[in-house]
Amino acid sequence: MLESKMKLVGKIREAHGLKGDLYVLVFSGEIAWAKRMKTFGLKAKDSDEIKTFTVERTKPFKKGLIVKAAEVADRTAAEGLEHMEFFIDDELMVSKPGETIFLSEIKNFKLKNPEQTVLGEIVGFSSNGVQDLLVVETTDGKTAEVPFVDAFIKKIDFKHQAVVMDLPEGLFDIENA
């Protein structure tokens, strides 16, 4: 499996039970993609190789999920995979129409105001504990964090790769002060 087609979403926290189940700590806590997952990849931190495993079953658990892989026969084998990085096919991180989007889907989109003026480019994401934040490189080369909340979002335009937001006046001025 190529890492470019895989997305790091968590790590194997520990073996779970006697039959080779794995407890995967998912960094975001969001596991809507788990039901569609047919394979996953594991990689040791000191390695470049991602080994592919076949999913037998999954179930939500704590801040992640329990996964049973066909290739992991028992607890001893599962313990040998503890602390490995957990990757999924990046196609699982694409929302369907009407679903909540994954933030990674709008990375590198332009941020525009309702008048269609480009305010910057979405270069990353952060959180203030209450809400997701878009990390935006503004047109003057500065960086601003913009709350990604329904009250500000007017449109997410996948065709033109733009997010249109009606932001409070002066938000960028406050960020860049």
From Swiss-Prot:
HAMAP family per record: Ribosome_mat_RimM
Record text on subunit structure and interactions: Binds ribosomal protein uS19.
Record-stated family: Belongs to the RimM family.
Pfam families, A to Z: PRC_RimM (PF24986), RimM (PF01782)
Top-rank lineage group of the source organism: Bacteria
InterPro entries for this protein: PRC_barrel-like_sf (IPR011033), PRC_RimM (IPR056792), RimM (IPR011961), RimM_N (IPR002676), RimM_N_sf (IPR036976), Transl_B-barrel_sf (IPR009000)
Record carries keyword rRNA processing: yes
Keywords on record: Chaperone, Cytoplasm, Ribosome biogenesis, rRNA processing
Function: An accessory protein needed during the final step in the assembly of 30S ribosomal subunit, possibly for assembly of the head region. Essential for efficient processing of 16S rRNA. May be needed both before and after RbfA during the maturation of 16S rRNA. It has affinity for free ribosomal 30S subunits but not for 70S ribosomes.
Subcellular location: Cytoplasm
Domains: entry comment: The PRC barrel domain binds ribosomal protein uS19.
Domain PRC barrel residue range list: 98-171
Name of protein: Ribosome maturation factor RimM
Lineage summary: Bacteria, Pseudomonadati, Bdellovibrionota, Bdellovibrionia, Bdellovibrionales
GO BP field: ribosomal small subunit biogenesis; rRNA processing
GO molecular function: ribosome binding
Disulphide connectivity of cysteines: none
One annotated Gene Ontology cellular component of this protein: ribosome
Record organism: Bdellovibrio bacteriovorus (strain ATCC 15356 / DSM 50701 / NCIMB 9529 / HD100)
Keyword Cytoplasm listed: yes
Gene3D superfamilies from the UniProt entry: PRC-barrel domain, RimM
Main location: cytoplasm
